């Protein structure tokens, strides 16, 4: 995976949305967006995989992965421009894809504040937390 973008003091709370705009690198077979407490504790691992034509969402606690949730709605491709919105709610995350389709993923770890954001495989043009 190409270089990563990281924020370690995010302060995202329920009711807030993260809006990401960027371009997927041309030479990747997947990209990722992680939200959580740190590298080892991820409340949301969002991972579109071009080589599998699927979007994988998961959690990681202490470096141990949970059960994958797979969605066969692939609206991404290498080199494409993307706009993704992730809304953090008490019990789940709503991810709005570039074509307007929404995915829901449960907040399995139950945290009410997220401190960590990382992204890979994307050239970020903007991100906004509101």
UniProtKB/Swiss-Prot annotation:
Q: One biological process GO term for this chain?
A: positive regulation of apoptotic process
Q: Which InterPro entries match?
A: ConA-like_dom_sf (IPR013320), Galectin-like (IPR044156), Galectin_CRD (IPR001079)
Galectin domain spans which residues?
A: 4-130
Keyword Metal-binding listed? The answer is no
The record's listing under Pfam families reads: Gal-bind_lectin
Q: Which residues bind a beta-D-galactoside?
A: 65-71
> What function does the entry list?
This protein binds beta-galactoside. Its physiological function is not yet known.
PANTHER family the record matches: GALECTIN (PTHR11346), GALECTIN-2 (PTHR11346:SF104)
Q: Under which name does UniProt file this protein?
A: Galectin-2
Gene (UniProt): Lgals2
